[in-house]
Amino acid sequence: MGGKMLRSVSELIYKVYARYLLGQINLNNLPGHVALIVDGNRRWARKEKRDRISDGHRAGAGKAVDFLHWCDELDINIVTLYLLSNDNLKNRNRQELNDLVQVICNLIAQVSKRWKVNHVGSCENLPELLGNSLEGVKSSTKTNRYSERSMTVNLAIGYSGRAEITEAVRKIVNTYPIGDLPEKITEEVISANLYTGGLSDPDLIIRTSGEQRLSDFMPWQSTHSEFYFLEALGPDLRKVDFLRAIRDFSIRRRSFGA
């Protein structure tokens, strides 16, 4: 009985604190585009003494879906989830990669039922199962069954920031005559040819696990982004952590390099 009472009190305090944080947020200065670098899944699995690393990836994916709901509640327009980098594809062992691909495929199916989904990355080196899942997302998005106010979710899968910029420049070089290139290679044209072409850059980038680096994530688009680093591992991310990040952003005065 004592344990149940303690849990009830703890849950009540948590709800009150979440409501307090929400009240501190300047709703007139919310980010239009939030990106989340989902990190720490493997460390979480080891910390929790799980038999399989995939348990950590599965828990992290579940928390990513929670994160999307939290963003949707605040009417944030665009959310980008960094799920699988090119380095992950090269460096993870086959079993872990196979498990991770299955987790991501399940996540894609779940997210695409509710929100508009874009793939941000290259399909070139992706496992066939994952590539097929992303192709299915393209088809479902074309049916235009989402409302105009539906949040857009970018899934960064098979992503590398350096590769993205390189590919954008190649597109430009292959599009225009050589003599026109000096005038055509501008910031605006490069931005338009990135995976995220046509979308706004992230206003706020959140990273879990205590690491304070970008890990090749959107080096071009993050020039004027605000950053918020969390000690919590991906699966341990809480709504109050999210609300603190949004509160912090909402009261910052952004300089945009000035």
From Swiss-Prot:
Keyword Cytoplasm belongs to the record: no
Function description: Catalyzes the condensation of isopentenyl diphosphate (IPP) with allylic pyrophosphates generating different type of terpenoids.
Active site residues according to the UniProt entry: 39, 88 (proton acceptor)
Lineage top rank: taxon: Bacteria
EC number of this enzyme: 2.5.1.-
Name of the molecule in the record: Isoprenyl transferase 1
Binding-site residues, substrate: 40-44, 52, 57, 85-87, 92, 207, 213-215
Enzyme class: transferase
Protein's organism: Tropheryma whipplei (strain TW08/27)
Any one of the GO BP annotations: polyprenol biosynthetic process
Pfam families with a match to the protein in the record: Prenyltransf
HAMAP family documented for this protein: ISPT
Named cofactor requirement(s): Mg(2+)
Subunit: Homodimer.
Entries under CDD domains matching the protein: Cis_IPPS (cd00475)
Binding site for Mg(2+): 39, 226
GO molecular function, one term: ditrans,polycis-polyprenyl diphosphate synthase [(2E,6E)-farnesyl diphosphate specific] activity
Cofactor binding remark: Binds 2 magnesium ions per subunit.
Recorded family membership: Belongs to the UPP synthase family.
Keywords recorded for this protein, A-Z: Magnesium, Metal-binding, Transferase
Keyword ATP-binding included in the entry's annotation: no
